[in-house]
Amino acid sequence: MNKNPIYRSEEEAKNIACGNVAAELDENSQALDAINGAGWKQTIACTIAQGTLGCLVSYGLGNGGYCCTYTVECSKTCNK
């Protein structure tokens, strides 16, 4: 039996506990395509909304006009 789950045959996949990994990955990718199929206009709108919300939360937490990240470099400047 081949140890790489992608290269297993259908018959070998029936004998393992996790089943056919390639088929499960295909089902998952189809589900993600259905969820994300709203189009690029909605994606751009969501990106703008998330960026604006992030800036508002950062300002509400005491950041004086710059968006913070969790990096060490930014933390020093945001704490001023």
Swiss-Prot record:
GO terms for biological process: defense response to bacterium; killing of cells of another organism. The lanthionine formed by Ser-58 and Cys-68 forms a putative lipid II binding motif. It is found in: Secreted. Residues 1-38 form a propeptide. GO terms for molecular function: lipid binding; signaling receptor binding. GO terms for cellular component: extracellular region. Keywords: Antibiotic, Antimicrobial, Bacteriocin, Lantibiotic, Lipid-binding, Secreted, Thioether bond. There is a cross-link at residues 52-55, 69-74, 71-78 (Beta-methyllanthionine (Thr-Cys)). There is a cross-link at residues 58-68 (Lanthionine (Ser-Cys)). The modification 2,3-didehydrobutyrine is found at residues 43, 47. Lanthionine-containing peptide antibiotic (lantibiotic) only active on Gram-positive bacteria in synergy with Flvbeta peptides, which are encoded by the same operon than Flvalpha.a. Shows antibacterial activity in synergy with Flvbeta.b, Flvbeta.c, Flvbeta.e and Flvbeta.g. Does not show antibacterial activity when tested with Flvbeta.a, Flvbeta.d, Flvbeta.f and Flvbeta.h. The bactericidal activity of lantibiotics is based on depolarization of energized bacterial cytoplasmic membranes, initiated by the formation of aqueous transmembrane pores. This is Lantibiotic Flvalpha.c. It comes from Ruminococcus flavefaciens.
